[in-house]
From Swiss-Prot:
Coiled coil: none
Protein name (Swiss-Prot/TrEMBL): Sperm protamine P1
InterPro entries per record: Protamine_P1 (IPR000221)
MF term (GO), any: DNA binding
Compartments, record wording: Nucleus; Chromosome
Tissue: Testis.
Quaternary state and interactors: Cross-linked by interchain disulfide bonds around the DNA-helix.
The organism of origin for this protein: Rattus norvegicus
Length: 51
């Protein structure tokens, strides 16, 4: 099974270090391509990365 993680950086190495999840709505990363996972604050937009 492929693992999906929410990341704000484009580099895969940084995404592997930290996993981000949406605590308010309890949403995980999307499973369809690269859609938005959860929004935190104003400047940060987390997207779904597949590894």
């Amino acid at each position: 099974m492929a693992r999906y993680r929410c990341c704000r950086s484009k580099s895969r190495s940084r995404c592997r270090r930290r996993r981000r999840r949406c605590r308010r709505r309890r949403r995980r990363c999307c499973r369809r391509r690269r859609r938005r996972c959860c929004r935190r604050r104003r400047s940060y937009t987390f997207r779904c990365k597949r590894y």
